[in-house]
Amino acid sequence: YLRETGLRVVFYPFILMDIQEGNGLADPWTGAANQPSIPWRGRITLSTAPGGHGSPDKGSGAVEQVSAFFGSAKGTDFNPADESVAYSGPNEWSYRRFILHYAHLCAAAGSVDAFCIGSEMRGVTQIRGPNGRYPAVSELCELALEVRSILGADVKIGYAADWSEYFGHHP
C-alpha cells in the first residue's frame, strides 16, 4: 500500500536482545557474571571480546563463532505462500535465517525500495580471523547477494553502520 501511494519504503530490521537482569550470562566485554539487560546490538561479539584475555579474535575460533552466528540458512529454505513464509532449513536461530525471512516477507508484500541487511553491529564487524580478514564482512556480503536474489535488482541493499564503523576498524 505505501508504495502504491508514492511513498518509498525502506525495510530496517532491528535486533533487540531480550537479555534480562541477573541473566547469569558472562559479559564477553568485561568478564562480569551477568551481561547488561537489554544491551545494544553493537555489543554482540565473540565468547570473549577482542582484546580480552583468551579472546579467539584473530584466529580460526573467531571465524567459527562468526559462522555460527550467521548460520547456514539459504533463501531456498523458505517457502512463501499466501500470508506466511514457511521455513524448512537447518534447525537454527541464526542471523541469516532472520534476515532472509524478512527478505521473503518483503517480497511477498510487494517488495520495498531499499532493504538493510543489518545495522550497528560493530562488535561483529570488527572481529578478525587469521591474516587480518574480517569474517563478518564476508558473511554480510554473501547475505547481501542472497537478499538480492530474493528482492531483485531494483531494490537498494545496504548495511546501516554505527558512527564508529564509518571510518573503518583501527585497533
Task: Please annotate each region the language model reported.
Residues 1-132, 155-164:
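Substrate-binding cleft and catalytic face of glycoside hydrolase catalytic domains
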Residues 132-158:
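Active-site neighborhood of glycoside hydrolase catalytic domains
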Residues 165-171:
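Distinct, well-ordered alpha-helical segments
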